């Protein structure tokens, strides 16, 4: 069952991944209209120019009947509807989703994102440019600028932590594909509190292949608890920076390979950056510090992810191919260094786009004797609705 990974295979994978990312990042998605340079019809009468309506004027004209001039929403009794309009002044709600999702619902109607049919389509009444103006006005209803905008909630990589504070449940599996097989599953619960903060719990459960080929499992690993704080965010620059402090408790069995035998402190910074053409960059760097030094080594790690999100169908599911670069070094003199690469792709599964899957493969670059791992997760953004909603 032993397998080697020649360097030329790794180089070929890297070249293919970089070529794919570069193609999606630097090629334009629009095609100029063939009639763009043709002269229009001539007229002898002087044109009359009027100022285009503002976002506020468009909102009051097209949206305020249901959503209210103040953005708080008109009562369902007054409207005769079953679904209450959202409160745009509630920053906890209004800040989370990017403009693109709001415009999709307004342009195509509620069902395009798995919401009520009572939200009509405005595609015949308002252009996408006018909807963007309306969105700019809707953003003024949340007056607390402490809340990071939803555009900064970049796709979650398989290993690198996100900088954006979220409400998510993630079930992930890491499968050793070589030698004696092993599977480590993690159930991750994340809950946001306040504008910038998040608490996280990680429950790992492991399975291992024995020498005789039989499997044993259900072993508890080292449980982790962490708190994240967004230190800086700026929608204009497309940047977000966070700090997380995580504690790994020695709940796993060290002899079975599912625990470290000591409490481990793991502080780290995470950074997210929106790039042109739907691309993005995410970086994480931090330290691992075992409380009992005899049971572990101090380690520094860095992780970087480059990817791009796109929609083959303008209003359909989102595809996000990514490649992660993962490095770690022990801090003692003459310590070990490890570098891995992990190509992967995240896909939204339902129309509401709050349930996602990510599949990837982690490949050792510096040492072919280390095992490769198949990695996969299912992510549920539970703030946006139940797991079975929006399909």
Locations of regions flagged by a protein language model:
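Gly/Gly-Pro-rich "capping" loops immediately C-terminal to redox-active cysteine motifs
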Residues: 49, 56, 68-104, 155, ...
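Electrostatic cytochrome c docking/interface patches
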Residues: 32-58
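Extracytoplasmic electron-transfer domains, predominantly the class I c-type cytochrome c fold
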Residues: 80-139
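Aromatic- and Gly/Pro-enriched helix-to-coil junctions and flexible linker segments
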Residues: 62, 129, 135-149
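The canonical Cys-X-X-Cys-His
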Residues: 55, 59-70, 119, 134-138
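Bacterial N-terminal signal peptides
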Residues: 14-25
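N-terminal secretory signal peptides that target proteins for export/translocation
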Residues: 1-8
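Transmembrane beta-barrel domains of Gram-negative outer membranes and organellar outer membranes
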Residues: 129, 145-391
């Amino acid at each position: 069952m032993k397998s080697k990974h020649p360097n030329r295979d790794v180089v070929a994978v890297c070249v293919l991944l970089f070529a794919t990312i570069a193609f999606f990042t630097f090629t334009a998605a629009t095609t100029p209209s063939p009639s763009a340079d043709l002269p229009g019809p001539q007229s002898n009468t002087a044109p009359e120019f009027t100022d285009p309506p503002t976002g506020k004027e468009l909102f009051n004209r097209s949206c305020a009947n249901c959503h209210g001039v103040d953005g708080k929403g008109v009562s369902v009794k007054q409207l005769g509807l079953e679904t209450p309009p959202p409160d745009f002044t509630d920053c906890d709600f209004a800040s989370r989703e990017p403009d693109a999702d709001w415009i999709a619902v307004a342009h195509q109607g509620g069902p395009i994102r798995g919401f009520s049919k009572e939200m009509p389509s405005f595609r015949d009444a308002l252009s996408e440019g006018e909807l963007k103006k309306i969105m700019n006005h809707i953003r003024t209803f949340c007056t607390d600028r402490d809340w990071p905008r939803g555009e900064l909630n970049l796709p979650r990589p398989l290993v690198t932590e996100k900088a954006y504070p979220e409400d998510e449940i993630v079930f992930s599996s890491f499968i050793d594909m070589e030698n004696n097989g092993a599977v480590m599953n993690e159930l991750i619960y994340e809950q946001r509190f306040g504008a910038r903060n998040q608490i996280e719990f990680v429950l790992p459960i492991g399975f291992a292949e024995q020498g005789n080929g039989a499997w044993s499992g259900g072993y508890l690993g080292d449980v982790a608890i962490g708190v994240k704080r967004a230190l800086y965010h700026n929608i204009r620059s497309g940047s977000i920076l966070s700090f997380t402090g995580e504690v790994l408790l020695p709940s796993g069995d060290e002899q079975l390979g599912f625990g470290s035998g000591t409490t481990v402190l793991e502080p780290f910074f995470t950074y997210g950056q929106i790039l042109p053409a739907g691309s993005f960059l995410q970086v994480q760097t931090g330290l691992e510090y075992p409380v009992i030094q005899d049971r572990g080594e101090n380690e520094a790690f860095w992780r970087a992810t480059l990817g791009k999100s796109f929609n083959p169908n303008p209003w359909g599911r989102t595809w996000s191919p990514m490649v992660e670069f993962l490095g770690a070094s022990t801090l003692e003199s003459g310590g070990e260094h490890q570098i891995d690469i992990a190509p992967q792709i995240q896909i939204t599964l339902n129309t509401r786009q709050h349930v996602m899957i990510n599949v990837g493969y982690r490949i050792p670059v510096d040492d072919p004797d280390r095992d490769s791992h198949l990695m996969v997760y299912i992510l549920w953004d539970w703030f946006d609705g139940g797991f079975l909603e929006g399909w």
